[in-house]
Amino acid sequence: SFLKWFLLLIPATTFGLGTWQVKRRQWKMELIDGLTKLTTAEPIPLPIDPAELSSLEYRRVKMRGKYDHSKELYILPRSPVDPEKEAREAGRLSSSGETGANVITPFHVTDLGITILVNRGYVPKKKIRPETRMKGQVEGEMEVVGVVRLTETRKPFVPNNDVERNHWHYRDLEAMCQVTGAEPIFVDADFSSTVPGGPIGGQTRVTLRNEHMQYIVTWYGLCAATSYMWFAKFIKKIKV
C-alpha cells in the first residue's frame, strides 16, 4: 500500500542523516587536527596587517619586545592545559581539578613599534596577585613565541566581563585594548616561553563545537527503532 512505502521513508531518511553526520564528524576531526598542527608549526614573524591576522588564528608567531606588567589582565576561572598532551588531545583539560587564571600582559613589540596583548599563561588562584610571583615578572627585551588568537563573543551562561574588578571571563579584544592601550592583537605564549616563577605558557585550547557523535547515535537509533516498527507492522504479517 501507499502508507507502507511512505512510512519506509522514515527509517531511510534517518539512516541517511546518520551517515551524513558520520561524514561531518570526520570532516570536523580533520579540521581540528589541522588547527592543532598549526599550533606546532614553525613560527613566522608577527604580521601587523589586521587583514592578514584575521586569517591566522592558531598560527604560531614570534616577536621580540618587553612586557608591561603594570597593566596585567586576568581571565578567570581557568584550569591548566597540559602542554605535553594539548597538541594530540585538541583542548582536553588537565585532570588536576585546579583552577586559577590566565595572565594577559601588554607586550611592546620592538621592531613593529606597537603594543599587543600576550597571554603569558596559567597561574593558580593563590598566585594571581603579581606580588606573589615577582620572580616571574621578567624585565628587559626577550623573544616570545606563541599562537595568534582572535576576539571572542560571550557564550551562553558565561558571565559578563567585570572591567572594574579586572575579572575577564572571555577574550573581548576591543574592551581589553581600551583598558591597556594595546593594539587588538592577541597571542597565547607557548610553553617554551614560560619563565621560572612565572605563568605556565602553552594554554591554547583548540576548540570547535563537535557534537556529531550525539547526532550519529540519535539518527541511527531512530533508524533502528523505526525500521523494527515498520518490519513488525508490514512484514511479519505477510508470508515471505
UniProtKB/Swiss-Prot annotation:
PROSITE patterns xref list: SURF1
Chief place of localization: mitochondrion
InterPro entries linked to this entry: Surf1/Shy1, Surf1/Surf4
Pfam families to which the protein is assigned, alphabetical: SURF1 (PF02104)
Intracellular or extracellular location(s): Mitochondrion inner membrane
GO biological process: mitochondrial cytochrome c oxidase assembly
Similarity field: Belongs to the SURF1 family.
Name of the molecule in the record: Surfeit locus protein 1
UniProt organism field: Takifugu rubripes (Japanese pufferfish)
